[in-house]
C-alpha cells in the first residue's frame, strides 16, 4: 500500500474520493489495453472475517463492492477479479470469497486463488472440495500465483531427485484438478509466480529455509516438473 494511502490525514469522505479517483484514473488509462484486473487483493482473515485495514476503516465494511463499482464504471469490458491466498486450502476463507462474489454477480467476473502451496498441502481431496464450491459460482477461475514449497520445515538439504519427482507430481496434480474441475468457459488460466528459484519471493519472505518452488533452477536449469 503506498504511503499516500497509509499516511492519509483527511476525512473519510476525502479518502473515499481519493481512492475513487485513483481507481478511475488507472483503469481508464489502461482501458482497452489491460484485459483484466485484480481489483481487490487479500481482504479476508483466515476465519473468513473481513480484515481490518485502512480501506475497511475509512470506506466501511462494503468497501470491496465500492472499489469494484468504480473499476466497472471505468472499463465495463475488463474482467474484474477478487484475489486471495489460502483459498485453495481454507474452507472458511474460500466461503467468504465465494459469498462476496455471489453477492456481486454483475461486478465480479472471477476469483483468483493464489496457490502458494507445498507438497503436503492442500491435499487433492481438499483442493477438489474447494474447487467444487468455487466453480459453482459460474465465474472465471484463475490460479494466479502458483508456486510449490518443497522445504517448509527445513528438512530438505538439497533439491535431490526424490524431491524433484515429488514436486513434479504436485504440479501435475494441480494442473489435472484445474482441468478436471473448471469448465473450459470458466478457465482464465494458471500463472506461475516466477521463473527461477533464485528470484522467488520465498527466498526472502518464506520460513527462512532454502527452497526450490518454481519450474526452473537458479541458472534456468530445466526441472523434471
Language model segments and positions:
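Active-site beta-loop-alpha junctions enriched in small/polar residues
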Residues: 39-42, 85-88, 113-118, 146-149, ...
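Active-site cleft segment of glycoside hydrolase catalytic domains centered on the general acid/base Glu
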Residues: 3-96, 121-129, 163, 202-218
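Substrate-binding cleft of secreted/luminal carbohydrate-active enzymes
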Residues: 142-144, 164-225
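First exposed extracellular module after export/assembly in secreted or surface-exposed proteins
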Residues: 2-8, 13-16, 20, 106-107, ...
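Glycoside hydrolase catalytic-domain groove-lining segments
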Residues: 57-80, 90-158, 172-188
Amino acid at each position: 500500500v503506498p504511503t499516500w494511502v497509509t499516511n492519509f490525514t483527511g476525512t473519510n469522505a476525502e479518502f473515499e474520493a481519493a481512492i475513487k479517483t485513483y481507481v478511475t484514473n488507472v483503469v481508464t488509462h489502461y482501458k482497452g489495453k489491460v484485459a483484466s484486473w485484480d481489483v481487490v487483493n487479500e481482504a479476508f482473515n483466515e476465519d473468513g472475517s473481513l480484515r481490518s485495514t485502512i480501506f475497511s476503516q475509512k470506506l466501511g465494511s462494503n468497501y470491496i463492492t465500492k472499489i469494484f463499482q468504480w473499476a466497472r464504471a471505468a472499463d465495463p469490458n475488463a474482467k474484474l477479479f477478487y484475489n486471495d491466498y489460502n483459498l485453495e486450502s481454507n474452507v472458511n476463507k474460500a466461503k467468504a470469497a465465494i459469498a462476496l462474489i455471489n453477492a456481486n454477480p454483475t461486478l465480479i467476473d472471477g476469483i483468483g486463488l493464489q496457490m502458494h502451496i507445498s507438497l503436503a498441502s492442500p491435499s487433492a481431496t481438499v483442493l477438489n472440495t474447494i474447487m467444487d464450491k468455487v466453480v459453482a459460482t459460474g465465474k472465471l477461475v484463475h490460479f494466479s500465483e502458483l508456486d510449490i514449497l518443497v522445504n517448509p520445515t527445513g528438512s530438505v538439504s538439497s533439491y535431490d531427485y526424490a524431491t524433484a519427482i515429488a514436486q513434479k507430481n504436485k504440479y501435475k496434480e494441480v494442473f489435472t484438478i484445474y482441468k478436471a474441475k473448471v469448465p473450459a468457459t470458466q478457465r482464465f488460466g494458471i500463472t506461475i509466480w516466477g521463473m527461477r528459484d533464485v528470484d522467488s519471493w520465498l527466498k526472502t519472505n518464506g520460513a527462512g529455509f532454502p527452497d526450490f518452488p518454481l519450474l526452473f533452477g537458479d541458472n534456468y536449469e530445466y526441472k523434471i516438473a
